Amino acid sequence: MVENKYQWKNWAENQSCSPDGIFTPINEEELLYSVRQAIKESQKVKAVGTGHSFTGTALTNGYLIDLSKYDKILSVDPNLNQVTVQVGKKLEHLSPELWDHGLAMSDLGDIAYQSVAGAISTGTHGTGLTFGCLATQVVAARVITGEGEIVECSMVERPDLLRAAVVG
């Protein structure tokens, strides 16, 4: 799960860093371990999806959490038109899987190679006056705090945390 001697580059290779550690969790338990290990070792943490941003926002000399393998659909509710998905899921893979359940995202950005987390946290948007950015489609989230605890938030429960978490 953690690699040694680290180098990370974004997709365009115009941003790179040498973090002290890279974690690649595949489930919530490993993700939580990654954050708690960083806390224990007084390391800063940055999370990345596909690295499809041109900016240096993902760069760190602390711990980098690579979410590319944290990419499963956990549940689908066609009656509510809702899906629960791990944030490393690429949009290019999410769309056809939603289609298999008779669902689709109401709005997509221009880049399908982004992860769900990247598209949401960077304010990715499509077109049209009636469509918000992808973050407006998020109705609930599980957030790991700086203390290493999981907090659930939604538009009903802790709505301020949800709004802060989705475009960050």
Task: Go through each PLM region and give its residues.
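N-terminal regions that are enriched for targeting/export leaders
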Residues: 2-12
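Short coil/turn linker and secondary-structure boundary residues
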Residues: 6, 26, 89, 156-157
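Broad hydrophobic/π-residue packing in well-ordered secondary structure
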Residues: 10, 91, 161-164
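Glycine-rich N-terminal segment of FAD-binding domains in flavoprotein oxidoreductases
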Residues: 16-110, 123-128
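Short secondary-structure boundary/hinge segments and terminal tails
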Residues: 55-57, 115-118, 132
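Short, acidic, Ser/Thr-enriched surface-loop or helix-capping motifs
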Residues: 78, 115, 145
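An acidic, phosphate/nucleotide-engaging active-site surface
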Residues: 93, 115-117, 139
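FAD-binding subdomain of flavoenzyme oxidoreductases
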Residues: 107, 119-168
